[in-house]
Every structure is written in C-alpha cells, then in structure tokens.
C-alpha cells in the first residue's frame, strides 16, 4: 500500500467519523484518548470494498485456504473479501450453540487447511487469539492475521509469541501524522495521543483469554531418547537419529508377499513400517517372523495400525491371540481412547512385559472426523497417566493443541503426507513433509500411496526421507 493510498484511506475513515478523540475504555481495559470505530463501514459499501481489496494486497507468510473475520466488526470486511476473491470463509461463534450442531466454527473446512484471520484493529491481540484458538482446536492452521489499524500497543508482539504474524494497512502513528498534516487534529491532542502510546506500548492480553500457547522449542531426537520412559519409545528415537530418518511408510498392500517385498525396498530409508495385517489375503503364521527379520536387517520398527477400540479384556485377546498374534511381532500398536483408559490397561498388561509401545489416536487425517478438541485433550491425559507404555500419538496438528503433553518424550506421527498437499475422493487429506514437521509440530511423517504407488518405491522413499529429515533439522533452534 503506497503512502498516497494510505493517506486517502485515513482521511475517508475520519470523514465517516470512524476515528474519534476523547476518553474511551478499550477491550484491553486501558483508557485511550483516541478510538477507532470501524463499525460505520457497513453504511459505506464503497469504502468497505476498498478496504477489503487493500487487505488482500498484504503479503501473508504462507498461502491460505480460508478466511475468518473476528466477530463482529471484521465480519463484513471478511465477507466482501471472500466474495471479491472467491476465497471460502468460516465464522467463529463467540459462544458455541447449545442446540443444533453446537459448533464453535461454522462453514466447510478440512483439518490442515490454512486460515487468514481478518480484524479491524489490534491493540493487545486478544480478539485475534480468541479466534485463533477454536480454529486451531479444529485442526486448522493459523499463521497470519491482517488488520486495518495496528494500535502499536503490543498486539504484534503478543501474536508473534503465539505463532501469528500481523500485517496491517496502517499504524496509529501513521493515522495521527496524516490527521495532523491535514488539520484534522490539534497539535495538543496529537501530543496527548503520542504520550499515551509511549506509555502503553506493551498491553498484555487480559487474563490471557483465548491465548494459544507459544510454539514450544523443539528438542532433538537424541535428547528426547534420554527422556523416554518406555524402552520402545527410546529405541524409536535412537533409530531415527542413527538413520537420519523420520519416515514411516504405510504398507497398505493387499498381500503379505507384496508387503515383504516393499519392506526390503524401503527398509534402508525408514524408521518405521506401518502395517494392516488384517488386509493381507495370503497371511500365514510365519509372516511375523519374516517381517521381523527384514526389520532387524534394515534397523526399523514395525507398527501394526490395528486401532484397537474395545474394552480392556477384549483388546488383550485381540493383541495376544487370534490368527495374527500381533504381540509376537509388532513393536508398536495404536488405539482409540473411546472406551476410556481401560483399553490402555488391557494392552499394557501384555505389551509392557515384552517392551512394546503404544500410540494413541489423538487426531485423524480424514475429513469430518471427530477426533479433536476435548477428545484430543483426553488422549493427552491418558498418555501422561500411562507414560511407561504410551510412547506418543497419531496426530495431525499437535502445534494447535490447547492442552499439550508435558513431556517431549511423547512422539507425534502424522499420516496423510505427500510431496504436494491435497486430498482424495474418500476424504483423506494430504500435507507436505515441511508443513507437517515445521507448521504442525509433528515428528514422524507417515507416507503411503506417495511411495507404494511410485514406479521406484526405494528411490521415492529416499526423497521423502531427505525432505522429512531436512524439515526436522530446520525446525531445531
């Protein structure tokens, strides 16, 4: 935005009395000699349209898929921008409905999509954070916010501490300079406003309401291995460090023959192989021993994606017995927490004596899934209560969790990874290695079709390993 356009916009805002001088109590609780009331924009469609267009020109740190206006003044701005640029919009409810769908976020969206927050003005950043929190709880990525006016009172810094970059059309200092230049404010009043700004440069978020935790400083895998309470969790970190690989291949093939051949091809590049033994049409009792031999040869762990979801007694039998005898050959299994903590007790009863580990399904990568918010928080609580057996989580966007694990010993593995983001006809959502590791705070990328459908799975696995490990290294302090 050039200086002439900015000056014209400031004068137009003053002309519609959107800029006022006097004594005003702000949302942050402080008393201000200047107040910006952009609610008047709804009565001036031409100016509203111009502001929406100008906000679109502000550069975001990453491409975005959705818009979300902060309730309520920014909603018409976001709506106009959505229509002008054909960018879908979602809406945050200030309070979730107690009836109907009881949603906190309205609109069509998919976990992993990036949202640009739109606000009229920012003081402490509290309103933006209050909007970012429920968006992130739904698995959406919030990295940027655009605003008409930055009051320069700590909002930019508060948002940055919570992983959000603020982009503004103008600052309060620039507003004051233009109004003074055109005789719209006296020098005495301008001095009063400048003194007010100097005295209130760091306004904190009131009560930290809606604040998202600052992005945690990532510890290296070698250091985290020393923190692990479970031997398999420790070994996984050690394998990752030794092979410089945070790649897990999802071997979703139809026969044991195909799976064993794939394991030989990709084994040198992976830290873990994910199986679905119950889809193998030619399964035989010696399958586990054959796979373990390949895993030992190439130094990777075996993760049976069983997704246990029954009561403790039943999962104990499913784990140890049946025709698959998963306990005998799978280093790691996973489970839903729908039945409650008893499912972990049942699996631990058999798995812990053999040094096995468990991943809890805290989130899923399919569109419309219900594993988020309180469900995810419950998974974290159960994991911390069973940290001797639970080694981590199947996650989609752990950086957005409002309740994060207290220990970095827990590992995050994220499915639905491909070189290019997108989705399939059955609702699976794909994200890139860099996005999963850097933006979403995961540790392991789980890649299926991107490798197993490739003409050269070994070479493709190597490319994914290099990308995944590079993303991990770039995320370290």
From Swiss-Prot:
The record's section on Pfam families has:
OMPdecase (PF00215), Pribosyltran (PF00156)
What family is reported? In the N-terminal section; belongs to the purine/pyrimidine phosphoribosyltransferase family. In the C-terminal section; belongs to the OMP decarboxylase family.
Protein EC: 2.4.2.10, 4.1.1.23
**Listed name of the protein:** Uridine 5'-monophosphate synthase
- Identify the keywords attached in UniProt to this record, alphabetized: Decarboxylase, Glycosyltransferase, Lyase, Multifunctional enzyme, Pyrimidine biosynthesis, Transferase
Name the Gene3D superfamilies for this protein: 3.40.50.2020, Aldolase class I
For this protein, the record's NCBIfam families field holds: PRK13809.1, pyrE, pyrF
Q: Which organism is it from?
A: Oryza sativa subsp. japonica
Q: Catalytic activity, per the record?
A: orotidine 5'-phosphate + diphosphate = orotate + 5-phospho-alpha-D-ribose 1-diphosphate; orotidine 5'-phosphate + H(+) = UMP + CO2
InterPro entries tied to this protein: Aldolase_TIM, OMPdecase, OMPdecase_AS, OMPdeCOase_dom, OPRT, Or_phspho_trans_dom, PRibTrfase_dom, PRTase-like
Report the record's Gene Ontology biological process terms.
Answer: 'de novo' pyrimidine nucleobase biosynthetic process; 'de novo' UMP biosynthetic process; pyrimidine nucleobase biosynthetic process; UMP biosynthetic process
Q: What gene codes for this chain?
A: UMPS1
Q: What is the lineage of its organism?
A: Eukaryota, Viridiplantae, Streptophyta, Embryophyta, Tracheophyta
Query: What cystine pairs are annotated?
Result: none
């Amino acid at each position: 935005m050039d200086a002439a356009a900015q000056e014209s916009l400031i004068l137009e805002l003053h002309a519609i009395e959107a800029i006022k001088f006097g004594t005003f109590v702000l949302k942050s609780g402080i008393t201000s000699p200047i107040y910006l009331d952009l609610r008047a924009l709804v009565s001036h469609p031409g100016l509203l349209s111009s502001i929406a267009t100008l906000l679109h020109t502000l550069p975001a740190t990453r491409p975005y898929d959705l818009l979300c206006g902060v309730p309520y003044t920014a909603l018409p701005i976001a709506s106009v921008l959505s229509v002008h640029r054909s960018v879908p919009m979602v809406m945050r409810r200030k309070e979730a409905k107690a009836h109907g769908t009881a949603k906190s976020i309205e609109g069509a969206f998919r976990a992993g999509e990036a949202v640009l927050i739109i606000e009229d003005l920012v003081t402490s950043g509290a309103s933006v954070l209050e909007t970012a929190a429920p968006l992130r709880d739904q698995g959406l990525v919030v990295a940027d916010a655009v605003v008409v006016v930055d009051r320069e009172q700590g909002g930019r810094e508060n948002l940055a501490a919570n992983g959000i970059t603020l982009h503004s059309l103008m600052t309060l200092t620039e507003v004051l300079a233009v109004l003074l230049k055109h005789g719209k404010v006296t020098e005495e009043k301008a001095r009063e406003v400048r003194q007010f700004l100097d005295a209130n440069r760091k306004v904190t978020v009131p009560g930290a309401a809606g604040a998202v935790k600052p992005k945690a400083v990532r510890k290296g895998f070698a250091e985290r291995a020393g923190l692990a309470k479970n031997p398999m969790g420790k070994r996984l970190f050690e394998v990752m460090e030794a092979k410089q690989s945070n790649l897990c291949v999802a071997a979703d093939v139809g026969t044991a023959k195909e799976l064993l051949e794939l394991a030989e091809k990709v084994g040198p590049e992976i830290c873990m192989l994910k199986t679905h033994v119950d889809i193998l049409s030619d399964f035989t009792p010696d399958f586990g021993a054959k796979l373990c031999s390949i895993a030992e040869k190439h130094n990777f762990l075996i993760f049976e994606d069983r997704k246990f979801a029954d009561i403790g007694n039943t999962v104990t039998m499913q784990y140890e017995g049946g025709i698959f005898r998963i306990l005998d050959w799978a280093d790691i299994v996973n489970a839903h927490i729908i039945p409650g903590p008893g499912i972990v007790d049942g699996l631990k009863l058999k798995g812990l004596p053999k040094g096995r580990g468990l991943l809890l399904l805290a989130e899923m990568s399919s569109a419309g899934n219900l594993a988020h918010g309180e469900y995810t928080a419950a998974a974290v609580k159960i994991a911390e209560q069973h940290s001797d057996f639970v080694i981590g989580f199947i996650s989609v966007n752990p950086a957005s969790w409002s309740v994060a694990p207290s220990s970095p010993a827990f590992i995050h593995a994220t499915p639905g990874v491909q070189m290019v983001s997108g989705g399939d006809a059955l609702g699976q959502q794909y994200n890139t290695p860099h996005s999963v590791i850097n933006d979403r705070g995961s540790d392991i990328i789980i890649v299926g079709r991107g490798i197993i459908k490739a003409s050269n799975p070994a070479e493709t696995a190597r490319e994914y390993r290099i990308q995944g490990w590079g993303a991990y290294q770039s995320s370290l302090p």
